[in-house]
């Protein structure tokens, strides 16, 4: 009998969505105070678990850097991060404008909030189908390539634990890709992912395998259960 595949040497890729940002403000791309605390608490959880990362990747957005800084405040000895622009989020305003020519309402009322996400779903679906091209953004295939190139890099360069800090869109896209699901699956995955949530892939040089998605082990107990946010 051959060795069990579960005994084969595998690395683990820990994908982290950024902490709470400034949704609805003039500058979304910065963490709130709660967002920093969420990520610092995740770093403390990782430290308590004895995780040691041999590699770190992050997107190039401000909220990615600030999230990693908060994680690192509780994780001494992290390797220098490799900045990977392919891990940047899509431009949600550009997606919205691709399907809505009228002035966009700030999502600060229940009705405006529902309209925001209805239009976002429509814009993302049409972008993925090649029916619209949001201004200043890559094609859907280009966006997907940015994400999968990061996964390829991890498989080819690492064998142990790797930390990746990104956004909901790229992480959801990575999950859908690994599961060989339709691209539109990434939309629903994306709209459910929580701030500072952890997603885990086991990996070998040939492939990634989903282990967990959108978990918050660092916020499972009081007083942290009130820290759960989505934007």
What are these regions (language model features)?
Residues 2, 7, 43-119:
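Phosphate-coordination/substrate-recognition cap region in phosphate-metabolizing enzymes
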Residues 163-165:
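ATP-dependent carboxylate-activation loops
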Residues 12-14, 19-73, 136-144:
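Loop-to-helix element that buttresses phosphate recognition and phosphoryl-transfer chemistry
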Residues 2-9, 88-112, 141, 156-161, ...:
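Acidic, low-complexity terminal tails and accessory targeting/binding regions
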Residues 19, 168, 214-216:
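Active-site metal-binding loops of divalent metal-dependent hydrolases
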Residues 168-172, 204:
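GST superfamily/GST-like fold recognition
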